[in-house]
Structure formats: C-alpha cells, structure tokens
UniProtKB/Swiss-Prot annotation:
Gene source species: Chlamydia muridarum (strain MoPn / Nigg)
Domain of life of the organism encoding this protein: Bacteria
Residues annotated as binding Zn(2+): C262, C273, C275
Name of the coding gene: ribBA
Stated family: In the N-terminal section; belongs to the DHBP synthase family. In the C-terminal section; belongs to the GTP cyclohydrolase II family.
Functional summary from the UniProt entry: Catalyzes the conversion of D-ribulose 5-phosphate to formate and 3,4-dihydroxy-2-butanone 4-phosphate.
Name of the protein described by the UniProt record: Riboflavin biosynthesis protein RibBA
Enzyme Commission numbers on file: 4.1.99.12, 3.5.4.25
Length: 424
C-alpha cells in the first residue's frame, strides 16, 4: 500500500524534476482516461526531448496554457460546443509563424512550444491550425478539475516554471495505450518519477492554503450556544462553515462531525435519508460533551452530484433503482465528495486530534490521508424508517458504510444500535 507520505515525497521529487528540465509521468484516475502522460516544462524543451516524447507517445503534443494566455495569444476554443466527455479545453492548434518548415518535425514543434513558453509572444507569433495543441487549464488546477492539463499547470507553478507544460499520452510499441504496470516499467527503465493526479491533489490540500476565513459569530441553538466560523473556498467561491462548541484550540480527542449539505434532509426533514437525523444527533452529542466541531460542507448535495441531479436520482429510486444505481444511471460517480476543504478548516481551527463522528469509511480514511489525526470513531445511532431502510442498507452493503443493523424480517426489539422512527 502506498502511503500518503510516499505520495507527497513523490510529488516533491516530481517538482524538482520539472525544475531540472526532466520528464515526469502523471497517471490519471481509473474513472477518467486511466492513462499516463509524459510531462515536461515548456521552457525546458529541446529537439532531443521532443523527439523522445514523440517516440513514446501518441505524438499528439499538448501544451497547458492559462485563460489569460489563451486570450493574449488569440487562442479560441477549437469548437463552439465541447462534446468531449471530460470537457478537455482544446484551443485551435498552432505552429510557430517563423523558424519552421512544415511544423510537424521534432525541431519545428520544439520551436512552437518555445514560443508558447515565451512571455513576449503575441498572437502573430503563431499560425493556425498547426501541430501543437494548447489546452486551457481550469483556475484552481487539479483541485478544480483532476485532469492532465491541470496537473501539468500545477507542476509548472509549484516548480517555479513559466505556466506552460507540454504532455502526451504514453503508448506501447504497438501504439496501444500504456496501463499502470506498463507505465511503471517504462518509468523504471528511463528513471522517471511517477505520480498520480490524486497524489498531486493531496499535496495541494496539504501545503496550499485553499480556504480563507470570512467571519465568525455566536449562534444560539436548541442545543445551546455555539460559535459559527464561515470559510470560503478560493477554488470555487463556495462558503462552508464550522459550528464550534467550547475552546477547541490545541485540544486532543475533539469530537468532530464532517457533514455534507443535504437541504432535503437537513431543512425539509426528508425521510429518504438519515442526513438530518445525523446532523441533529451530532449537535446534541457535542452539546452534551461541551466540546466539539461540526464542519458543514456546502455544495455536496446528493453525494456531490448537485441538488437538481439528486432529485432526478430520487425519481429513479421511486422506479426501483437503489441510491447507487440511480447515480450510475445518471452517469455520476457513486460518491463524488471530497474532503480537502474540511481538512483545511479543521487545521485552521488548530485541533490536535479528533474523534470522528461517522459511519463512512471513505470520509474517515480521506481525512486521515489529508493529515487529520483521528484517534478513533464515535458511533451514533442509526435512524431507520420505512422510507430510508433500503437507502441505509444500500450504503452498508454496496458502499461499505459501517452500519450495524439486522435484516428486515427481524423484530424491532432485536435492534441494538438502531433507533427506529415512525417518520414518513
């Protein structure tokens, strides 16, 4: 098993390699393209390195650029309607307007990349179309969009390079796509550092400051007085908050609940899920302890698919799909939530260690991976109703949640860790 520390060390080596003018390999997520790209700083390119890139990849040489670079260099989108599954932001392709022949040779493409990496280049420095494919990186990098374009741009920034990286997809001798073991063998043969997009995401959540504190105030609730601290994501502008009970600074073993926004459950009292009940019980528990934190993550409706799509999933569930099948039917991941914002908020609150209130193993292990020191897990009762029993069982059986309740035909008095409700 590759540890978080090993992943961070690999990213640190990759950053050094980029600064030194060496290739690195970035492997994509299995749920996306599931391939590896050779990446090099545009300003470090040479005809020899370009020839190596062309010899071991598809030969489609991409160059990451910022939105501002695309504007200044007059690089419009390749098409008006982007139908690519991953919304890869191709601009028109380019060649250097001088100093080349046909534009396709290693030397010619090197010249084009050198101009893309030159801050003095202007629109007239290029002709269109050409043999190098600029891709516009999303602001926020891999935290915003976990693609090779953003990975390339993040590596350039972290290495102190001009914001233009070149990359192409690795292929085997028969031009089939390299997969993980083939990529690792190739990297070992040539001495290249390999990282994953997720390694880079973890690195950025660990070392970059990606949330900012906005405001704080006292807030009286039915469970007593809390303090609310509002944070804003600098990636997408979403505002999240932490409800804090007691003086938690530098405290050990602080009860913490990381709660994803669920308007239907938290506000409307929907019985399709147990979200509202979990939030209510967490507030009550923390109030009784006199110490604790609830981090409330907004923008995570429907396990990260959005409010409108969650309601679509509800309609599919009424047709017989379970909560996992409904997401997949809508072409969404089973669980698209990420917890980097929560980790940064908890670090800003200066907790030393926490006891996490959760049944969700993904949340538990991801927060650990992001540097949160979790001592143990607090188990609160599961609220079961006729409306949410199948939902809860699906979370247990298909998503691996740590829920402990008996089969449907057992009598109610046999439930030990479950509370039943007549709701709905």
């Amino acid at each position: 098993m590759v540890t978080c520390e090993a992943g961070i060390a690999s990213v640190q080596q990759a950053i050094k390699d980029i600064a030194d003018g060496n290739f690195v390999i970035v492997i994509d997520r299995e749920s996306r393209e599931n391939e590896g790209d050779l990446i090099l700083a545009g300003e470090k390119v040479s005809a020899e390195k370009m020839a190596f890139l062309l010899s071991h990849t598809t030969g489609i040489v991409c160059a990451s650029v910022t939105r501002e670079q695309a504007r200044v260099l007059d690089l419009p989108a390749m098409v008006q309607e982007n139908q690519c599954a991953f919304k890869t932001a191709f601009t028109v392709s380019v060649d250097a307007s001088s100093g080349i022949t046909t534009g396709v040779s290693a030397a010619d493409r090197t010249r084009t990349v050198q101009l893309l990496s030159d801050p003095t280049s202007i629109s007239q420095s290029f002709v269109r179309p050409g043999h190098v494919f600029p891709l516009v990186s999303q602001p926020g990098g891999v935290v915003k969009r976990p693609g090779h374009t953003e990975a390339s741009m993040d590596l350039m920034r972290l290495a102190g390079m001009y914001p233009c990286g070149i990359f192409a997809e690795l292929v085997n001798a028969d031009h089939s796509m390299m997969r993980q073991q083939q990529i690792l063998d190739f990297a070992e043969q040539h001495g290249f550092t390999v990282i994953t997009v997720d390694d880079l995401i973890t690195y950025r959540w660990t070392f970059d400051s990606l949330v900012e504190h906005v405001s704080s105030a006292r807030i009286p609730t039915k469970y007593g007085e809390f303090f609310i601290h509002v944070y804003k994501s600098i990636i997408d502008g979403t505002e999240h908050f932490a409800l804090v009970k007691g003086d938690i600074r530098e405290q050990e073993s602080v009860p913490v609940r990381v709660h994803s926004e669920c308007l239907t459950g938290d506000v409307l009292g929907s019985c399709r899920c147990d979200c509202g009940a979990q939030l209510d019980m967490a507030m009550r528990y923390i109030a009784e302890q006199g110490l604790g934190v609830i981090v409330y993550l907004r923008g995570q409706e429907g396990r990260g698919i959005g409010f409108g799509h969650k309601i679509q999933a509800y309609a599919l569930q009424d047709l017989g799909y379970d909560t996992v099948e409904a997401n997949l039917q809508l072409s969404f991941p089973i669980d698209a939530r990420e917890y980097g914002v929560a980790a940064q908020i908890l670090k800003d609150l200066r907790l030393t260690s926490v006891r996490l209130i959760t049944h969700n193993p993904k949340k538990f292990f991801e927060l650990q991976r992001l540097g949160i020191h979790i001592l143990d897990r607090i188990v609160l009762p599961v609220i079961v109703s006729s409306e949410n029993e199948r939902y809860l069982r699906t979370k247990k059986d298909r998503m691996g949640h740590w829920l402990n309740f008996p089969v449907l035909n057992e009598s109610e008095d046999e439930y030990e860790t479950v509370e039943r409700t007549s709701c709905c």
